[in-house]
Regions:
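Phosphate- and other anionic-substrate recognition elements at nucleic-acid/protein interfaces
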Residues: 2-21, 25-26, 31-154
Length: 154
């Protein structure tokens, strides 16, 4: 029995969280998985100018295996105007944390889905107008979308 527990513990220590980023001009929503990568949860929303410091602090405290960033595309599949801000951030992130892979995930409709999730969850109109909450929920949707896409690759 003790061996089984030790093996389970070692297994958990080898896995890291997946961190999702819904990058915005002013605010950035963040979401993260549990260490077993089963559940996507909203983490927080931070001012974008503090994002890199927040991530660096977070990866010191928590094991992060991968980072996924919402890829803003227009309906015609062309990059949106926000891409000019996201690409330099992702390039810097890859340089500062070369041991953690960074991937893009299509983020079309995440804000619409976030608002619908808030309505379905019974949030009052005043709470639904909190942009920070919308950004955090959008990051959670990006993360869940990434996790769902991996299920089909296994």
């Amino acid at each position: 029995m003790a061996q089984t527990v030790a093996l389970y513990y070692d297994f958990r220590e080898q896995m890291g969280r997946i961190l999702a980023i819904d990058y915005g001009k002013k605010r950035t929503g963040l979401a993260v998985t549990d260490v077993l990568q089963i559940i996507a949860n909203g983490l927080t929303t931070v001012p974008t100018h503090t994002l890199m410091d927040f991530i660096l602090d977070y990866v010191k405290r928590e094991p992060v295996e991968r980072i996924v960033v919402g890829l803003p595309k227009q309906m015609n599949n062309q990059p949106s105007e926000n891409m000019v801000r996201i690409e330099p951030f992702v390039n810097r992130l890859r340089k500062v944390l070369p041991q953690i892979p960074v991937e893009y995930v299509d983020e079309r409709f995440t804000s619409v889905l976030a608002h619908q999730a808030m309505i379905d969850g019974g949030l009052k109109k005043k709470d639904r107008q909190r942009k920070e909450l919308v950004d955090e929920i959008s990051a959670t949707i990006i993360l869940q979308s990434y996790m769902d896409s991996r299920k089909f690759k296994i």
